Amino acid sequence: MKAMEERTVGLISASSSRASLKTQLENGYPRICDYCEPTIEFLSSSELARHIRQDHTTQEGGSFLCRYGEHGVCQKLPLEGVCDVDFEAHIRRCHTSQSVPYSRSTSCFTEDNEEAASLRSIRLTSDRDTPTIEKKKFTLHSFTQNLSAVLADPSRSRNDLSTFFTRHWGDTFVPTQPVPTSKRLAKMADASFDSYCQAAGESYKRYQAVKRALRLSHTEGTESGNERQDAEDLPTVFIDPRFTLGDSSTFSAVFTVPANENLDALKQTLSGKNVIPATPLEVAINKKPGEFRDYEALQNRLEMMHDVVDGRLAGKLVAKTDDFWQVVRSYSGLQEQLANALQCVMVVRKNLKHVDELVCDQTKKIIEVHQKYEQKKHLLAKLNDIACLREAQSTVQMMLSQGDYPKAIECIETSLDVLSKELNGVTCFRHLSSQLRELYSVIGRMMNEDFTSLIQKEFGVKPEAGTLIQAEGELSAVLLGLMRMRKYTFISVLREEIIEGVKSVMRHVIKSQILNSGVDLSDFDPSLTQLGEPVRRMKHADFLKTVRAVMDEEYFFCKRLEALQDILLETAQRAHPSNRHGSEDIIIERLEEAKLNESDSDDETGSFSKSTSSGGFVSGSAVNSNATATTLLSIEVRSEAFLKRVLPLIAEFGHQCAQQRISRLLIARAKNASVTEATTPTQLSECIAIVKEYQSQCEEEGWYSTQNQKAGGLGRAINKLSMDYIEKFHAARKMRIGNMLDTELWKATDVSIIDQNMVDQAIETGMLRSSKRIDDGPTKKPFKRTGSSATIDSGTSVSNQTGIIVDEESFVVVGSSITMIQILADYCEAISKMPTFAQDWNSRVIELLKTFNSRCCQLILGAGALQLVGLKTISVRNLGTIFVNLTLAGRSLELVCRFIPMVHDEMDRVLPDDRKSLLRYFKGVESEYRDHVNEIAIKLISVIAHYTTNCLGMWDVKGNIPSPEFQQICRHMLKFHNGLTGIMPRDQIESLFRQVHENFKANLREHVTGMGIRPHDTLKYGYVTQDYMYYQQNVKNMESCRNLELESLNDIMFD
């Protein structure tokens, strides 16, 4: 403490001596910043205001926000900020004019940093003359924060502030689940708790009684011990610090009798007790209010009070005697310490003076010498700058002649920087700045022209083997110069040149392939400016060769663009090595992002995304929300940030341009209807395979970063071509089967060996394929069938047969059913070749099957059946024709129904798992076919039943055996049987006639019963028996009905 006092005195005296050299400071200054580390000292309010504006202020638009406060928030300013004028008023009112603690305002300006730091750490207290070191004590409250400052913290998000009180505990601060009871605590009964309360209650009562008695005894002992020590039992009028007898009211209160005895000033004390009660003499004397008191009694009373006070003072003096003498004895020692302290101070001052002479003065001289050296060095640097600026223009011209654009630009920028900072105002260089700027702009135009010529030369000539970019060094120099000048228009030039380069590569390849394919070019322009029609006249193999060649060349062109892209990225890193983004870059970036969001919606949603197929190239949900490379490069580049964003997309942009050109090539050939009709699914699948292979190569190179394969132009074009082909394929087959049904005569047709081989191949392999594809394996010999047996002809005969054999079962059918099988084979082949469009094929196959079924049933069972075969009414003559037509229709539907499962299996192999539910339509169609076949069988039975019923209605039991009616019935039955034989299988004919026989039995029993013929009528019943036996004999004679079990007449009548 003693050393601190000595240092304090010395520092204060030193600072006082130097304060006379400074100007008069403002009131409350100098002062320090309360929130900056290390500490900064300000001599005036203007300096503090400037500091607050620079370091504790943020600007948002035209508003200023004050950050001079805890946690960077000033609680005296609105959060939304104020204008500039109001902000200046706020600083003056709330920060620069506030009174500050003495510890910060008493630190004087000094050049000695150590002394200034010491003075700022010393505080002179108001109750002591000795200085003390102010230390900030660390307590629990050091962790507290201002709640309003925390809620107004601009670094927190609005969501954090809105959920500040509820994000941890919820809205109610109440636990949602009750706390379970502990298993370690035993459950206590109410009786046990009652006994505890009684025992504890008695103890607590005894404790309270003892505590109360102790407090009372302590109070009484205190009062008795201090009774003579306190002044509370003395009249208050004598202990009042303002007591004076010169005051009339005080004089009257002491020497006169009061009007009310209770208001006597000599009896009023603080404690209510009087140390000197009234004497009996004073009580006996009766005086009127306002008269003087009795002199003798008053004198005695005052003397007694004096004695009491004198005794009490003497007691206190006796009690303080030891302390008093201790102070007296220590005074001499204190004087010695003060003398020693003065000697030490004198020694310290003498030493400090000696140090000042030896060290400080020498240091000042060294500093002055160093300052002079720095000034001269700075002057020499400026002279060197002047010398360099004199040669600036000639140096730039020399660098331009050498083609070193980056160094020339750097020289100009350095010269302009020196002119604006170091040599600002030099008269001899007043025109140099404008001359350099003009030269700067000229260099920019020159570099743009050089870049355009270099790119055109690069894209116009195919590079040598092993190299992708020929003029790499020249391009790097020009690009580095353009990027340092921040002239980004070369991106637009590069974009246009890429588009033209893709076009020229494609045209060159197509012309070469047209000349090599041998297409007749006599009808075309020799220059081949229009390539659409020659491409359409090319053969399919030549066209696929052309497409592959175009894709290979475009892929190589994109690889060259990728090499150019690497050069651009490397140059951009050299030109702008830092990642700084100014406010202007951020604003431009946001504007460009807004443009991108509008252009994406138009660019990505095209007319090609119409496929309902889940496996197609484009689906409805495949629209990419991000901007594509084409969209990004179509925007003008005005910032370094956006340049770095588009540079990695150069190769992808070229790839997207190539996709568009290849898509136009594919669509140009598809515009010719004859070419589309002649295209087979195999040919189309080969084209799709080539496209997918090209897309896979490009995806491996990373050229689908902003746009996937399905959303790309090439994918959409292939999808459109495939969907158009499917529509035309389906329309042609639908029209073909419709024309066949319209012209169908419903007569048995001959089956060619080609169709029979197609069916045999389908039964053998389980896959229905067109007859054109049965040439992959060994050549099959044609079948030659006779009846139900089949033999293989050793020759190459192309003779036809009356029925088609399916799994050892003969089908005699009409020509439209054979055509339908051929069409189904075409569909199966198309499904296997184009599996990604299985969903679209599925819907069209189902539609075709339903159309064939409905048209057949409409023509056979509907109102158009008679007109179709040229009949007006159904009579006995044309009954056989109608019967045969119905039979042929049923067998035709059965034949088509046999091949529906094969189509189902073909579709099952290619449909994805999430689309397997579409196969249920095949089961529905197959069920419809079987229902219609059953309806035809019922129709046949109803026709036979109708004629037998009519004959039985005309039957009369007479003596003619057999009767004419039964002869007619048997004749028609035989005719029906012969009509079915050769068309329907024997088992089906037998089943049909079994149902006819059941109907005949019911009609016969009903008719005989109606005529009243009974077995006891021997004659008539015998005639009936003879007719029925004739019927049995004729039925048994039919080849297909020999196994029928025919009952006797008695069994029919009495069963």
Swiss-Prot record:
Q: Where found?
A: Golgi apparatus, trans-Golgi network
Q: State which gene encodes it.
A: vps-54
Could you identify this protein by its name? Vacuolar protein sorting-associated protein 54
Q: Report the source organism.
A: Caenorhabditis briggsae
Q: Does the keyword Coiled coil apply?
A: yes
Coiled coil ranges: 363-383
- List the residue ranges of the region (Disordered): 774-794
Gene Ontology biological-process entries: Golgi to vacuole transport; protein transport; retrograde transport, endosome to Golgi
Name the keywords, alphabetized.
Coiled coil, Golgi apparatus, Protein transport, Transport
The entry's family comment says: Belongs to the VPS54 family.
**Under the cellular component aspect of Gene Ontology, which terms does the record hold?**
cytosol; GARP complex
